[in-house]
C-alpha cells in the first residue's frame, strides 16, 4: 500500500503568474479572436444588406431585421427582468438568521462560496435566460407582423361567429404570448424556489416550519400567476377547438368542432376556466392567510376536474351518445367542415358533371374528327426528352438542360402551339478544367432557349425544334440569350471586371463577353471584398487580381431562392419555368399565401400532397413551404426573375386574398398591382401544378357536398400511381390543350385522373383551365364516372398495352439491339362520352442512350392501336380517316454529309431502315432482324468514318448537331454520333439573335 504518512513526497512546484510577455500575447490573441468572431458576424449581416440593396428589396431586409431585433430585445428583456426580479426578491426576503441544522450548515458553504460573485451570478443567469427567450421570440416575426397588420376576411366561423382573421392572425400571437408567460412563470418559480432554499427561506429536512412567511407569500403569488395563465389557456382552448385537427373517417387532419367538441369539450373548457380562476385567487389569498392549505386543495381539485371533466366526460359522450348514432350526431358539423374546406382551398367552385364513360356515337368518321378537335395531344413528354435535348442541342459539355423540361404556349401564324421548352444552362461539371478562375470568372452563364413542338416529332422520332442551335435561332425572334440566373446556377460568379467570360463557341472559335447588367454587388470596396471572402470562405476574393474596377459578384441565382429571399412570407411552387417575354428570358415562379388557422378547414401537408413521381426523382421540383401544414392556400402572387439581370418582380394575382393584403401592409411596395402585368407576360402564365395537386388531393374526399355521403365513405377517391413507371408514386398532372364537354374550344389545361380508393378503375377525370387571361381561368371541372359501370383507369390501360400480344411482340422487338423502351405520359382525353388514352413510346437506342419517339399507343372504347404516328393510331382505333387537315408534322429529310465515305454509309443506313419499315408492315420478323443488323452496321461505319474525318481536320468541323448524322428513326433507336462530341455550330457570329447587353 502507498505511504499515506505526512513525510515529504517530493519537491513542490510553485506556479507563479505568467510573465508580462505571455500575458500580452494571450490578451492579444483573445482580442483578435473576439474581433475575428465579430467580423464574421458583421460579414454575414453586411453581405445580406448589400444583396437586398442590389435587388432593390432593402425594405424587406430592414423590416424583417428590425422586427427580429425588436422582438429579441423586448421579450429577452421581459424574461430577464422577470427571472432577475424574482431572484432578487427571494434574496431580499431571506431570513436574517438561518436555523442551526445540518441542512443549513451544508448550505452555508455554498452561500459563502457565491457571496463575492452574487451580482455577476445574477447577471449571468438573467442574461442567459434573456438571450434564449429573445432568440425564441425573434423567430416569431411572421406571427407578429400578421397580428399587427392583419386584415379581416369578412367571413365568420359558424361556432363562435368570429372573423376568420381572429384564428389566422390573432390566435397564433395570443398562443405565443401565453407560452412566453408560462415559460417566464415556471423559470421565475424555479429560480425563486432555489434562492429561497439556498438562503433558508425553504427547508426540506430541518425541523419546524418548512417555509418562512415571506417565502410562502412569494411562491404563492408565482403559483397564482401560473394557474391564472392556465385559466387563460383554457379560455383560448375554446376557440382552438375550431382549428383543432383530429383523426376522423380516415382523414388524419380533419379540422373543426365535432359533436363531442361542441357538447363536451367546449363546456368542459369553460368550467375548467372558472375553476382555474378560483384556484388562482386562492393562491393570491395566501398573502394574507399565510397557509397553503386552501390553494393546494384547490389545485388538486383543478387537476382532478381536468381529468374527469376534460377527459373522462368527453369520452363518455363519444362512447354512449355519438357512436350509436354517429351520422345523425356528426352531420351538422361535417357540413360546416365541408363548406369551410372547399372555401379555404378554392375548390368550392368545382363543377362536378356525370359522365357516361362510354360513347354512344356510331359515326366513326365523326369520332375521328372529334378526336382532332377535342385535344392537341402532346406526344413530346417533357419529363422524358431532356436527354434528347441534351444530345442534340447541348453543343458544349459545359451546357446542360434540366432533368424535367417545361410546357408552355407560343403563337405562330395566330395559332397557339403547345411547346416543350428548356434553357441551355451552365454546367460547371462539364468545363475542361475546374479551378477558381474557370468556375467563377470564365464560365459564368448559359446561352439560349431550345424549344420544340409538343404535339409532334419528325420522321426520325426527334423533336421538331422551333428554336435551336447556338446562338439560338427560330420562331422566337431576337431576345437576350445569355442566362446568368437559372435552375442550375447554384454557385457565385464574379463578372464585369478585367477577366473576360466565355460566351459561346461557333465554327470560328470561342466568343467572349463581359457582363453589362446592373445586378450583383460591386466588389470595388475592400470592405465588400473582405466581407465576401469571409462569407463564402474564399480568401482569393480579397486579393485576386482577376477582380478589379467594375467587378460584381452574382449569387442567390436560382429563381426560387431569389423569390423566397425577397418575399420570405411566400410559399414557392416547385416548378419555375422559363418564357421569352418582350425579348427577354423570364423565369416565372408561382407563389402562394397560406395559413393553418382557417376554422373548420381540414389541414393538408404540402410536402406529402405535392409529391409525385417527378419530385421523387428531382428534389428541385419540391415545394418551398413556409409552413408544411396548411388549411388555406391561394396562388396570390406571380413572380418573374430576369435570366440576364436577375431582377425579381412580384405581381399581385389574387386581388381578394386577405393574407396577401396583410403581407402587403407589412411590406408595402414590394408587390405590384395585378394591372401592371403586361399582356405579353399573361400569355405565358398558367395554373400552377402544386396548387392543383393540393386541390386534387382534397377533392378525393371533398367533391361531395352532403354530410351523409362524406360520412359513409362510399365515394372516396385516390390519386393513382404513375402507370409509366413502377415507382409507386402518384401520377403527376399534365398540361395539354383540350376542351371539356361543356367547352366550345380548346384551352390550355392541367389534367389528372382519379380512381376509387383501393381500386384501379377510373372514378373521375379532373381538369382546370390553366390559360391565364381567359374568363374561366382556374375553373375546375370534374367528370364523374358511373359506379354501375367499370371504366378502365390508367394503370389498367397500361396493363392492357403491355399484355396485348401484338403490342408485346412489337415492344420486344423494339428492345432488341441493346435498346431500351421508355413510356411517356399516359394522357387521358374525354371524347364523346368515352375516354381516349394516348401514350407515346420512346426508344433509347444502342450506346447513345437518348430517347426518340418511335410509336404511339392509343385506346378508345376497347380498341387499341400501336402505330408510328398519332394519326395512324387514331385512324386504326376509330376505323376511319380524319377529314380535317392534318397538322404539319415537321418532317425532315435525312441529313447528308460532304464526306463521301460517311455519305455512302448513311445511304446504306437509309436503305436498311426502309427495309426494316417494310418488314414491320408485313410483319416479317426475320427480314426485320436482318435490316436491323444492317442498319446498325451502317451507322457504325458512318460514325467511324466521321470520327476519322474529324481527327484528320483537327476536330474543328462537324455536321449540324441539330439534325444528327444519320437516319435515326430505326426502331432500335440507333442514331448519329453524339452532337456534344463535335459541338460547333454551322452559323456565323452574325446569327446571334441576342439584342446585345442591356
Curated annotation (Swiss-Prot):
Cysteine disulfide links: none
Biased composition (Low complexity): 966-998
Basic and acidic residues: compositionally biased ranges: 939-951
Family: Belongs to the UPF0182 family.
Ranges annotated as biased composition (Polar residues): 893-902
Ranges where the record places region Disordered: 879-902, 939-998
Superkingdom of the source species: Bacteria
Compartments in which it is found: Cell membrane
Major subcellular site: membrane
Keywords tagged on the record: Cell membrane, Membrane, Transmembrane, Transmembrane helix
Residue ranges crossing the lipid bilayer per the database entry: 25-47, 69-91, 120-137, 176-198, 219-236, 266-288, 295-317
Topology of this chain in the membrane: Multi-pass membrane protein
GO cellular component, one term: extracellular region
Protein name from the UniProt record: UPF0182 protein SAV_3055
Amino acid at each position: 500500500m502507498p505511504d499515506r504518512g505526512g513525510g515529504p513526497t517530493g519537491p513542490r512546484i510553485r506556479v507563479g503568474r505568467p510573465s508580462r510577455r505571455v500575458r500580452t500575447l494571450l490578451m492579444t490573441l483573445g482580442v483578435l479572436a473576439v474581433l475575428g468572431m465579430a467580423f464574421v458576424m458583421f460579414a454575414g449581416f453586411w453581405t445580406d444588406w448589400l444583396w437586398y440593396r442590389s435587388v432593390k428589396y432593402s425594405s424587406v431586409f430592414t423590416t424583417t431585421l428590425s422586427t427580429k431585433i425588436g422582438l429579441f430585445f423586448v421579450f429577452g428583456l421581459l424574461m430577464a427582468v422577470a427571472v432577475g426580479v424574482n431572484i432578487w426578491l427571494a434574496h431580499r426576503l431571506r431570513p436574517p438568521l438561518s436555523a442551526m441544522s445540518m441542512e443549513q450548515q451544508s448550505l452555508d458553504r455554498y452561500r459563502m462560496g457565491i457571496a463575492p460573485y452574487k451580482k455577476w451570478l445574477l447577471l449571468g443567469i438573467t442574461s442567459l435566460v434573456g438571450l434564449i427567450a429573445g432568440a425564441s421570440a425573434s423567430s416569431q416575426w411572421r406571427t407578429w407582423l400578421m397580428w399587427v397588420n392583419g386584415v379581416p376576411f369578412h367571413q365568420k366561423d359558424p361556432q363562435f361567429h368570429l372573423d376568420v382573421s381572429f384564428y389566422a392572425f390573432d390566435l397564433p400571437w395570443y398562443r405565443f404570448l401565453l407560452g412566453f408567460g408560462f415559460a417566464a412563470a415556471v423559470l421565475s418559480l424555479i429560480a425563486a424556489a432555489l434562492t429561497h432554499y439556498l438562503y433558508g427561506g425553504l427547508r426540506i429536512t430541518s425541523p419546524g416550519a418548512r417555509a418562512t412567511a415571506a417565502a410562502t407569500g412569494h411562491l404563492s403569488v408565482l403559483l397564482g400567476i401560473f394557474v391564472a395563465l392556465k385559466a387563460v389557456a383554457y379560455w383560448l382552448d375554446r376557440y382552438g377547438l375550431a382549428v383543432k385537427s383530429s383523426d376522423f373517417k380516415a382523414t388524419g387532419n380533419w379540422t373543426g368542432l365535432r359533436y363531442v367538441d361542441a357538447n363536451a369539450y367546449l363546456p368542459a373548457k369553460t368550467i375548467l376556466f372558472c375553476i382555474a380562476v378560483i384556484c388562482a385567487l386562492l393562491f393570491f389569498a395566501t398573502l394574507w392567510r399565510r397557509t397553503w392549505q386552501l390553494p393546494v386543495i384547490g389545485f388538486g381539485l383543478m387537476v382532478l376536474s381536468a381529468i374527469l371533466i376534460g377527459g373522462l366526460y368527453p369520452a363518455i359522450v363519444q362512447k354512449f351518445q355519438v357512436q350509436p348514432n354517429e351520422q345523425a350526431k356528426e352531420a351538422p358539423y361535417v357540413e360546416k367542415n365541408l363548406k369551410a374546406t372547399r372555401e379555404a382551398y378554392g375548390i368550392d367552385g368545382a363543377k362536378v358533371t356525370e359522365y357516361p364513360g362510354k360513347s354512344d356515337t356510331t359515326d366513326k368518321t365523326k369520332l375521328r374528327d372529334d378526336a382532332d378537335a377535342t385535344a392537341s395531344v402532346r406526344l413530346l413528354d417533357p419529363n422524358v426528352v431532356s436527354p434528347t435535348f441534351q444530345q442534340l442541342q447541348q453543343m458544349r459539355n459545359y451546357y446542360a438542360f434540366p432533368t424535367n423540361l417545361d410546357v408552355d404556349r407560343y403563337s405562330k401564324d395566330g395559332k397557339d402551339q403547345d411547346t416543350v421548352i428548356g434553357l441551355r444552362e451552365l454546367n460547371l461539371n462539364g468545363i475542361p478544367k475546374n479551378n477558381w478562375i474557370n468556375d467563377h470568372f470564365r464560365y459564368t452563364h448559359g446561352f439560349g432557349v431550345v424549344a420544340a413542338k409538343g404535339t409532334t416529332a419528325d420522321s426520325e422520332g426527334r423533336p421538331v425544334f422551333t428554336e435551336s442551335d447556338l446562338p439560338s435561332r427560330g420562331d422566337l425572334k431576337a431576345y437576350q440569350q445569355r442566362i446568368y440566373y437559372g435552375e442550375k446556377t447554384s454557385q457565385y460568379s464574379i463578372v464585369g471586371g478585367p477577366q473576360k467570360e466565355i460566351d459561346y463557341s461557333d465554327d470560328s472559335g470561342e466568343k467572349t463577353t463581359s457582363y453589362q447588367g446592373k445586378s450583383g454587388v460591386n466588389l470595388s470596396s475592400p470592405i465588400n471584398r473582405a466581407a465576401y471572402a469571409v462569407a463564402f470562405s474564399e480568401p482569393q476574393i480579397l486579393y485576386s487580381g482577376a477582380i478589379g474596377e467594375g467587378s460584381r459578384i452574382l449569387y442567390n441565382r436560382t429563381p426560387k431562392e431569389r423569390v423566397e429571399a425577397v418575399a420570405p412570407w411566400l410559399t414557392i411552387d416547385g416548378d419555375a419555368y422559363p418564357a421569352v417575354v418582350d425579348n427577354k428570358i423570364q423565369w416565372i415562379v408561382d407563389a402562394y399565401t397560406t395559413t393553418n388557422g382557417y376554422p373548420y378547414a381540414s389541414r393538408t401537408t404540402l410536402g406529402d400532397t405535392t409529391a409525385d413521381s417527378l419530385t421523387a426523382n428531382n428534389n428541385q421540383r419540391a415545394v418551398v413551404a413556409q409552413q408544411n401544414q396548411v388549411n388555406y392556400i391561394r396562388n396570390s402572387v406571380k413572380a418573374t426573375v430576369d435570366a440576364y439581370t436577375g431582377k425579381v418582380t412580384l405581381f399581385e394575382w389574387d386581388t381578394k386574398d386577405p393574407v396577401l393584403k396583410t403581407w402587403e401592409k407589412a411590406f408595402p411596395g414590394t408587390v405590384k398591382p395585378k394591372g401592371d402585368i403586361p399582356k405579353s407576360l399573361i400569355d405565358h402564365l398558367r395554373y400552377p401544378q402544386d396548387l392543383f395537386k393540393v386541390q386534387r388531393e382534397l377533392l378525393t374526399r371533398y367533391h361531395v357536398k352532403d354530410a351523409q355521403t362524406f360520412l359513409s365513405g362510399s365515394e372516396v377517391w385516390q390519386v393513382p400511381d404513375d402507370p409509366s413507371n413502377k415507382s409507386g408514386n402518384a401520377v403527376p398532372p399534365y398540361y395539354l390543350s383540350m376542351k371539356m364537354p361543356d367547352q366550345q374550344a380548346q384551352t390550355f389545361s392541367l389534367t389528372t385522373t382519379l380512381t376509387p380508393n383501393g381500386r384501379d378503375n377510373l372514378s373521375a377525370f379532373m381538369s382546370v383551365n390553366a390559360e391565364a387571361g381567359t374568363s374561366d381561368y382556374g375553373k375546375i371541372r370534374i367528370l364523374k364516372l358511373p359506379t354501375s359501370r367499370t371504366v378502365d383507369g390508367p394503370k389498367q390501360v397500361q396493363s392492357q398495352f403491355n399484355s396485348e400480344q401484338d403490342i408485346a411482340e412489337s415492344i420486344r422487338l423494339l428492345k432488341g439491339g441493346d435498346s431500351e423502351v421508355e413510356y411517356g405520359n399516359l394522357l387521358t382525353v374525354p371524347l364523346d362520352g368515352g375516354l381516349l388514352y394516348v401514350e407515346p413510346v420512346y426508344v433509347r437506342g444502342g450506346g447513345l442512350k437518348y430517347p426518340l419517339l418511335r410509336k404511339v399507343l392509343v385506346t378508345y372504347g376497347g380498341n387499341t392501336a400501336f402505330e408510328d404516328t398519332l394519326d395512324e393510331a387514331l385512324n386504326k382505333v376509330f376505323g376511319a380517316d380524319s377529314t380535317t387537315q392534318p397538322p404539319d408534322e415537321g418532317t425532315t429529310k435525312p441529313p447528308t454529309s460532304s464526306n463521301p465515305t460517311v455519305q455512302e454509309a448513311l445511304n446504306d443506313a437509309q436503305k436498311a431502315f426502309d427495309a426494316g419499315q417494310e418488314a414491320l408492315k408485313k410483319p416479317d420478323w426475320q427480314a426485320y432482324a436482318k435490316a436491323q443488323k444492317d442498319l446498325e452496321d451502317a451507322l457504325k461505319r458512318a460514325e467511324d468514318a466521321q470520327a476519322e474525318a474529324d481527327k484528320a481536320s483537327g476536330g474543328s468541323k462537324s455536321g449540324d448537331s441539330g439534325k444528327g448524322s444519320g437516319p435515326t428513326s430505326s426502331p432500335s433507336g440507333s442514331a448519329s454520333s453524339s452532337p456534344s462530341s463535335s459541338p460547333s455550330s454551322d452559323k456565323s457570329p452574325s446569327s446571334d439573335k441576342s439584342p446585345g447587353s442591356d
